[in-house]
UniProtKB/Swiss-Prot annotation:
This is Conotoxin Vx2. InterPro entries: Conotoxin. It comes from Conus vexillum. GO terms for cellular component: extracellular region. Residues 1-20 form the signal peptide. Coiled coil: none annotated. It is found in: Secreted.
Length: 68
C-alpha cells in the first residue's frame, strides 16, 4: 500500500512540480519599482521621430524644430 502511494506521489510531482506554483515574491504588487520604471515611453519613441519633418509655430518652439 505504501509503495503505491509513493508511486502516486512521484507521478504527481513529475506531472505538476512544486515550482509551477506561484510564490508570493512573484506577484507584481510586490515589485512597484518594476511597474513604474517604464512610465516614460515617449523617450524611446522620440528617438525614432525626425523633428525636421515638423514645424513649430508658437512660443514652445525649440532649436531642433523647423519654422513654419
Amino acid at each position: 500500500m505504501m509503495s503505491k502511494l509513493g508511486v502516486l506521489v512521484t507521478i504527481c510531482l513529475l506531472l505538476f512540480p512544486l515550482t509551477a506554483l506561484p510564490l508570493d515574491g512573484d506577484q507584481p504588487a510586490d515589485h512597484p519599482a518594476k511597474r513604474t520604471q517604464d512610465h516614460n515611453l515617449a523617450s524611446p519613441i522620440s528617438a525614432w521621430i525626425d523633428p525636421s519633418h515638423y514645424c513649430c509655430c508658437g512660443g514652445g518652439c525649440t532649436d531642433d524644430c523647423v519654422n513654419c
